[in-house]
């Protein structure tokens, strides 16, 4: 969290370099800019949100350490654990809105927060698989992780692959069917513009490869195959984050 807070501070301090709409709002002050695009409000909510998440997770770790000491400690740990998913989803949604969706002030998607959360959580699972594999293969864990555990990881990766493509297609289909220029211009520009390679690579790495391979039990029971799929998911998610931010200017640009 300290590193995340420092990176957040750097992004917020960059102003127009991080949020291109700041320059446009200054040059065209007479144009309507949603209240959500108030820079002071943005900085305050992002900083307070990060602090709130840090505090909740700090309490979670402290109570987890003594959760087996007594029934009361177990209950206190359970209570704070119930708040962690809410904090993660709410703050994750705000990050999705501030750093991606609203980069183009006129563009909105009701499902974007959920799609962003599911995508990033899938990447977290993929990172966890690789991290455990790296530590386990080098004998760095106090208790080695058995190979059958990777099958459970593979099933979770498969589930979040399906959830991701569901939310992705739900958003894409709604925008395509509505056919409103203010909504379609951003998606079609990323799909057909200079970022088209990254766009289609994202779909291949985040859906085609995981869905195709993890559908077969031998792959799910293979440690190396599961780790390879996890690597594809991480790269695909990085492509996804890049194309949504970098492609905001009509899908035109170098990368």
Give the positions of each predicted feature.
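Long, contiguous internal "core" modules enriched in hydrophobic/ aromatic residues
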Residues: 34-202, 216-219
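Alpha-helical transmembrane segments of multi-pass membrane transporters
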Residues: 214, 219-220, 238, 245
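Transmembrane alpha-helical segments of integral membrane proteins
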Residues: 210, 239-250
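Interfacial loop/helix-cap signal at membrane boundaries in integral membrane proteins
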Residues: 18-40
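Central hydrophobic cores of alpha-helical transmembrane segments
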Residues: 225-235
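Short, membrane-exposed interhelical loops at transmembrane-helix boundaries
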Residues: 184-191, 246-255
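Membrane helical hairpin/interfacial module
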Residues: 1-18
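Core segments of transmembrane alpha-helices
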Residues: 203-211
């Amino acid at each position: 969290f300290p590193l995340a807070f420092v990176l957040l501070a750097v992004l917020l301090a960059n102003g127009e370099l991080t949020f291109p709409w700041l320059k446009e709002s200054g040059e065209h002050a007479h144009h309507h800019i949603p209240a959500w695009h108030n820079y002071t409000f943005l900085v305050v909510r992002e900083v307070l949100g990060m602090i709130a998440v840090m505090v909740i997770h700090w309490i979670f770790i402290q109570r987890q350490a003594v959760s087996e000491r007594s029934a009361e400690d177990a209950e206190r740990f359970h209570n704070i654990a119930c708040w962690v998913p809410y904090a993660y989803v709410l703050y994750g949604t705000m990050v999705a809105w501030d750093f991606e969706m609203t980069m183009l002030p006129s563009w909105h998607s009701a499902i974007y927060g959920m799609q962003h959360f599911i995508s990033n959580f899938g990447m977290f699972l993929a990172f966890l698989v690789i991290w455990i594999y790296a530590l386990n293969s080098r004998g760095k864990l106090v208790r080695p992780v058995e190979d059958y555990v990777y099958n459970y990881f593979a099933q979770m990766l498969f589930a979040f692959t399906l959830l991701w493509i569901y939310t992705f297609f739900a958003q894409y289909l709604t925008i395509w069917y509505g056919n409103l220029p203010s909504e379609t211009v951003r998606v079609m520009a990323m799909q057909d513009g200079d970022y088209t390679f990254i766009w289609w690579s994202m779909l291949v790495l985040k859906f085609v490869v995981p869905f195709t391979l993890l559908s077969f039990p031998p792959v799910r029971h293979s440690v190396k195959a599961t780790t390879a799929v996890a690597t594809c998911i991480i790269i695909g998610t990085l492509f996804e984050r890049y194309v949504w931010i970098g492609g905001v200017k009509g899908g035109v640009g170098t990368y």
